[in-house]
């Protein structure tokens, strides 16, 4: 994938809010990318502090955002390294929020025979990027209308999020994936460097799995998975960003809102 844009590597400590002095250096030959995702480096650090009424829709009625285009450097890299997700049990990922800010109401565990093998509206994976301590961190997050396991007893709950943070050397001409930190049962499981058996070209392969009576979590796998339509945080509408903050989904909140996102970067930092 050809890139001529250069980034200015920034060292920052990120105590919880973005450093708005971060920027990309754009050569004249790539000025068409002047939209350079102010987003990922400015990162709209207000979503957690805004309160509004959040409406809910049935889990299979949320319309996903159109997939992001490689129209700026951040989006280009996020698409290049988008991980695959292998599903062998439980629900498939569904859209969590629509352009108006309506969120999924999820699916109760008591709905034993209700299908959750994929939304008729299409699927979605959510991304958010930030330059942290000189490395480009990209979070990929999936929403599941419920998390359940068929064991001697029926275990689970309505609404679930899983995520992984990919750590990339920099936004230079030849970005390289250095580490993957997948949210596990306890903390993060780090794959640094990622082994070739877990890679499919530039895509890291993740599995949505469970163990005994645990909740589902993410782990590396040799099995190929599927791609979902990627939407980046900064390409979402303002209403959607606010709705994915701490007000949505009660105890099973999205990892994309400011507080949880920056906490995840600190906890998953692998170097």
Swiss-Prot record:
Keyword Glycoprotein applies: yes
Pfam family, one: NPP1
Keyword field: Glycoprotein, Secreted, Signal, Virulence
Signal peptide region: 1-47
One annotated Gene Ontology cellular component of this protein: extracellular region
Domain of life: Eukaryota
Annotated compartments: Secreted
Motif Conserved heptapeptide motif: positions: 156-162
Location of the motif Conserved undecapeptide motif: 137-147
Residues of this chain annotated as glycosylated in UniProt: 235
Induction or repression: Highly expressed at multiple time points in both early and late stages almost the entire host infection process.
Xref: InterPro entries: NPP1
Primary residence: secreted
Record text about domains: The structure of NLP effectors is remarkably conserved with a high level of conservation of a central region containing the conserved undecapeptide motif AIMYAWYFPKD and heptapeptide motif GHRHDWE.
Similarity remark: Belongs to the Necrosis inducing protein (NPP1) family.
Function, in words: Secreted effector that acts as a pathogen-associated molecular pattern (PAMP) recognized by the plant immune system. Seems not to induce necrosis in Nicotiana benthamiana leaves but significantly improves disease resistance of Arabidopsis thaliana to Hyaloperonospora arabidopsidis and causes an inhibition of plant growth which is typically associated with enhanced immunity when over-expressed in Arabidopsis.
Identification of the protein by name: NLP effector protein 4
Native organism: Plasmopara viticola (Downy mildew of grapevine)
Gene: NLP4
